[in-house]
Curated annotation (Swiss-Prot):
Protein name as catalogued: Thiazole synthase
Family: Belongs to the ThiG family.
Catalysed reactions listed for this entry: [ThiS sulfur-carrier protein]-C-terminal-Gly-aminoethanethioate + 2-iminoacetate + 1-deoxy-D-xylulose 5-phosphate = [ThiS sulfur-carrier protein]-C-terminal Gly-Gly + 2-[(2R,5Z)-2-carboxy-4-methylthiazol-5(2H)-ylidene]ethyl phosphate + 2 H2O + H(+)
Gene name, Swiss-Prot/TrEMBL: thiG
GO CC terms of this entry: cytoplasm
EC number: 2.8.1.10
A Pfam short name: ThiG
């Protein structure tokens, strides 16, 4: 049986599905979806949360016993991302951070230069850094060499639901990585999540695929099952693809 435990930066999680909180119509629906997903780690965009009041999303995660993963979503440069991460560490008491440094609001693609700069500073400052990155094997290797605890390549741009645009690059990142690979962004439905795991990813992070679905709790349950199925399939080993048919029963 495949190992169901996700290990990142010395921490262990019983689910390989990491959830995001953006896009939910209200906290009640978000709560139902989080419970249905079985997630043990969920991102929180710190620029959009009032941490001091202890209300809203952070209070919900605390009540459900789900670890909060602060996120530097919306940051446009290394300095802004580093400051946001430092404030999150003060507010939440965790050194784990999902590092996002975006290039522009239209594509929400990572700014590779600023991302590397921010990652270097945060690793030096003792953070456990999980960077949201392009599906670029060279950049992923660079982030690992810096000391990031995982790499989180996108499947396709945030919120597009286009699935995994370049599965070959994801496979190359997985093959070269010595740290966990988390497919982050672009998931549209359960088959996308299963494919990410079949390609060898250690986990999947998604938000709007669930929070903006017609029935978020049901989609969350589907995603959880898909991640488990994809992980099991990867561990089991698929049969090779063949050009010609091959009978499954021997000739008598």
């Amino acid at each position: 049986m495949a190992d169901s435990v996700l290990r990142i930066g010395g921490r262990e999680f019983g689910s390989r599905l990491i959830m995001g909180t953006g896009g939910a119509p209200n906290l009640s629906v978000l709560e139902e979806a989080l419970i249905a997903s079985g997630t043990e780690l969920t991102t929180v965009a710190m620029r959009r949360v009032d941490a001091e009041t202890g209300t809203g999303v952070l209070d919900l995660l605390n009540r459900l016993g789900i670890a909060a993963l602060p996120n530097t979503a919306g940051c446009r440069g290394a300095a802004e991302a580093v400051l946001t991460a430092q404030l999150a560490r003060e507010a939440l008491g965790t050194d784990m951070v999902k590092l996002e440094v975006i290039a522009d609001e239209r594509t929400l693609l990572p700014d590779a230069v600023e991302l590397v700069k921010a990652a270097e500073q945060l690793v030096d400052d003792g953070f456990t850094v999980l960077p949201y990155t392009n599906d670029d094997p060279v950049l992923a290797r660079r982030l690992e060499d810096i000391g990031c605890a995982a790499v989180m390549p996108l499947g396709s741009p945030i919120g597009t639901g286009l699935g995994i645009s370049n599965p070959h690059n994801i496979e190359m990142i997985v093959a070269a990585a010595g740290v966990p690979v988390v497919l982050d962004a672009g998931i549209g439905t359960a088959s996308d999540a299963a494919l990410a795991m079949e390609l060898g990813c250690d986990a999947v992070l998604l938000a709007t695929a669930v929070t903006r679905a017609s029935d978020p709790p049901t989609m969350a349950a589907a995603m959880a099952s898909a991640v488990t199925a994809g992980h099991l399939a990867r561990q089991a080993g698929r049969i090779p693809k063949r050009f010609w048919a091959q009978a499954s029963s021997p000739a008598l």
